Amino acid sequence: MAGKDVNEVGRLDEKKKKKREDLLNATYELFTSKGVFDTSISDIVKKANMAKGTFYLYFKDKYDIRNALITKKAGELFSVAYEKMYRKKFSSLEATVICAADVIIDQLNEDKTLLEFIAKNLQWGLFHKVLLEGENDVSKSFFDWYSELIATSGRKFKNHELVIYMIVDLINSTCYNVILHEEPVGLPELKEELHQLIPVILRTQEIVEKS
């Protein structure tokens, strides 16, 4: 009997996860085609083929689901970066961070809809939530991996969370026009500049002990 109860709870949890995922997917389609302002909760539940009451079991309003979507999509970016990076060895901390930045940039270049959505909505509070809580174990693992990189480098920084935020925000703000409109330069040129700027960010945030 106990086994049946456990199985039933498991099935209910999976059902809830699927409904939440369906709501997120429907919302993403609408937000990226109509915009957040012009999308109503009625639009979302119609797209997801659910009753309006079901929406409120998971989210308070459309801004709550927008925040959940940003957390999810940004988390997926970091998940891919982690999967591609965590087994690789690099000559320096700078080289590692530059390569991780390139992985994130390449994802945004491949999915311009995602670029537009994240560029308009990513904020420090949500970024912090993605890194520390993670939409899934892998996105949180990115921050654990990054923290370990800092620790094993033997270098100290004022705030290593702020360092990665500054780098991601730099990518977010500079890539938008370059990827979508190839202005003021093309992506290869922008990458070259970012490769120069990332070490500068690391140096300015580093605590250098005086001998």
Regions found by a protein language model. Give the residues of each.
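Hydrophobic/aromatic-rich alpha-helical bundle segments in the mid-to-C-terminal region
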Residues: 151-197, 208-211
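Amphipathic alpha-helical packing segments from all-alpha helical-bundle domains
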Residues: 79, 107, 113, 126-154, ...
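Helix-turn-helix
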Residues: 30-64, 68
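N-terminal intrinsically disordered/low-complexity leader segments
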Residues: 1-18, 206-211
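Hydrophobic alpha-helical connector segments
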Residues: 68, 82-110, 167
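Short linear capping/connector segments at secondary-structure termini
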Residues: 82-86, 118-126
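Generic hydrophobic, amphipathic alpha-helix propensity
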Residues: 19-28, 44, 65, 69-77, ...
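Short hydrophobic clusters on alpha-helical segments that form packing/core surfaces
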Residues: 23-31, 104, 171
